[in-house]
Amino acid sequence: MNDLLSKHQFSLISNPNVALSAPYGAEQAAVLNTEGLRTARREISSWPGYQPTPLVTLSGLAKAANVGSLYYKDEGRRFGLGSFKPLGGAYAVFRVIEGEIRRTSGQQVTSIDLFDGAHRDVVADVTICAATDGNHGRSVAWGARMFGCRCIIYINEAVSEGREKAIASYGAEVRRIPGSFDDAVRMA
């Protein structure tokens, strides 16, 4: 294992600005909180094909890197997307649709309600737009297809044709633009 690390540039850098004793205040809790995590888990675990994914222990690599332990959460097979981050984009699609339904009808909905066809008319009028270099766009496109809304994904000129096709295979309109990822973000 040490041979593996010696063949590659590797350095462990500690964050010099970390404040381990800093309070987790209202500003942080507004973004990431226990209730939000419970809600996300409840919704995502209700999606068709949901299965927990493994947490893999990389003890040899941890030893070679001189760290106490190292773990890898293997998301690559989740929902058959072949993406290392399949949940966030699709969950964001749900949250946008959920918010639009709440805004237009005052009703609270779940993923199951949407799978059962509730508010199909509202969902059909939603267009989700995002920029990506690949994995995020695949998740967003899959989520849009799953929930029944339109999806436009912007990619930059350097994104491979394979990634473009993978995103388009979920029904998204993919728009390739000149420039960088930041240019794709501006278009989205």
Describe every region a protein language model picked out.
Residues 1-188:
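PLP-dependent amino-acid enzyme catalytic core
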